[in-house]
Amino acid sequence: YLDEFRAGGLGTGFGNSWVKVGPIKAHHGNSLSGRTAWLFEPYDMVNPATGERDYYGIPPDQTQSELDSLIFTIHEAGFQVGVHSNGDREITMLLDAFEKALARLPRSDHRHRIEHASVVSPAILQRVKELELVLVLHSYVYEHGDKMEAFGADRWSMMHTNRLALDMGIPVAGNSDYGVSAAIPMLRIQSLVTRTSAEGKVYGPEQRISPEEAIRVWTMGSAYSVFEEDIKGSIEVGKLADFVVLSSDPTAVPVDEIKDITIRMTVVGGGIVYEGN
């Protein structure tokens, strides 16, 4: 329906501060928690079909040519696109598609996004930076750290790479991936900070970020990912008065207690819309 959207004057950014058209969501690849993401190296598990350790996940439905066409069509229409992709092998296909689209039709400040980008490498992140993409990374280690076991401990340091992406200057946005993990921002922030599961196991401590950085990812990072950093993401003169009042300072409490912080008040557009006990 891209033609119909364009004919109606609709596109990424259309709307107002309450309701706005965002990116087009696309899928390329499979699931991290379902152990179906497509990888270059095999999972650290036995392939139930062969009895061998030769399971690489499930290849995407789209061929490279089909993916190239999809990304270019959305890009040419002037939309931002956010593409679900988890495994390093499927992400590499996606980067190839973005590279071709941008070479064919250069566009500055496109902010195309990869949703999840769960298993990567330094080389993949370098391409992400060069293509000026935004990463919307998982923060669900608290509930789903055990799902990372199938990928092998050697890979944990290159999964959900918030630390490395930030250090490289790649824009990172926070999210709950609700439906897979709970839409509880303070729990999500704790997960970014500790990389520790509910059972107390740490997965990839190299990718921990500070509470201050995690808050920024969830505020300014998320606002940037939808072209709203000039009106949202921080409390400043000239921006919308959207903020929450917390029961404690997440930068001051023990990191394993961040999840217990509650919302005392929510203010939207300068008006109180929620007050807790």
Identify the residue ranges that each predicted region occupies.
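Extracellular/periplasmic ectodomains of large secreted or surface enzymes and adhesion receptors
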Residues: 276-277
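His/Asp/Glu-enriched, well-ordered alpha-helical/loop segment
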Residues: 72-82, 89-112, 116-117, 122-126, ...
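Metal-coordinating catalytic core of metallo-dependent amide/deamination hydrolases
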Residues: 1-88, 127-134, 189-191
